[in-house]
From Swiss-Prot:
SUPFAM superfamilies associated with the record: Glutathione synthetase ATP-binding domain-like, Succinyl-CoA synthetase domains
Name of protein: Succinate--CoA ligase [ADP-forming] subunit beta
Gene of this entry: sucC
Function: Succinyl-CoA synthetase functions in the citric acid cycle (TCA), coupling the hydrolysis of succinyl-CoA to the synthesis of either ATP or GTP and thus represents the only step of substrate-level phosphorylation in the TCA. The beta subunit provides nucleotide specificity of the enzyme and binds the substrate succinate, while the binding sites for coenzyme A and phosphate are found in the alpha subunit.
Source species of the chain: Stutzerimonas stutzeri (strain A1501)
Family: Belongs to the succinate/malate CoA ligase beta subunit family.
Amino acid sequence: MNLHEYQGKQLFAEYGLPVSKGYAVDSPKEAAEACDKIGGTQWVVKAQVHAGGRGKAGGVKLVRSKDEARAFAQQWLDKRLVTYQTDANGQPVSKILVEACTDIDKELYLGAVVDRASRRIVFMASTEGGVDIEKVAHDTPEKILKATIDPLVGAQPFQARELAFQLGLKGDQVKQFVHIFVGLAQLFQDYDLALLEVNPLVIKTDGNLHCLDAKINIDSNAIYRQPKLRDMADPSQDDPREAHAAKWELNYVALDGNIGCMVNGAGLAMGTMDIVNLHGGAPANFLDVGGGATEERVTEAFKIILSDSNVAAVLVNIFGGIVRCDMIAEGIIGAVREVGVKVPVVVRLEGNNADLGAKMLSESGLNIIGANSLTDAAIQVVKAAEGK
């Protein structure tokens, strides 16, 4: 689950971290009023969406009058912002963040992520702030500085000082960086975060450090124990298919291809996508129905897959372990009939009662193509998607 920038900065402020004075507004009138509350002669207005690249897409602007702030809000509220991180439909804008203008001398990067290899929280810092950090890591990995947090003792000031010196900070800047580093580490731990970024962390013209942006991603497996963050969720930013899948405890991720995939087990699902790619196909989604592939869940899975107009064929790849393949076949037949599937469906069943399940599918009279192996299934679904 992601938070908006204004929500992330609210959390930063609670931990005493330096952020700009600002207000999240949902009307042009409130945008103008926010300028009065903040004071000054220049403000920054930012469209609030769960995506990067807002500035290049026109979603961030420096304004010099209340009328400009009002006009920006009028332009973007209830519209969709398309950036390089969104699909062609973009993300809906329901709030605008109006902030005091910050005079910047230099931009840095500071972020933290759960590193699965070390099973630790790892902080990353760089002198290359305000740009895509993934590109920096790819092109100039030596510019990424790291500090690994020991979960038994937490973030230590000496780690922050080491990073600060490598970033070229001096005097009071080092003390300020230690404060920000330790505060962010505590925030990361307290709220079960998966990722946190301040990009950019800026040095202002007066020499002080300032958190100019806030990106926060919460571990979805820990949301149940973070009611405060759960209440911050903005469903309008979620893919409606992924939201539908979550209600049925289906793991679904939309992709750009035209072959729908329904598989039980995340590892098998990834392997299925790989072999479809190997044979020239492009998966339209990742969908793991889990161990409880009941007729009801299979029906909902079909509905979700077919809600994507790009889907030209569907591959169902099920391994019957605890759940028998004949029961799965029953569910597939019932789902295809209920949903009224118009595209070819290729089914590969393996495991418990696989032969009986395959027989039921072949005798169903439906447009279901049986496959005798995963390779055969991939070849057949690619041909079906191409209309061959």
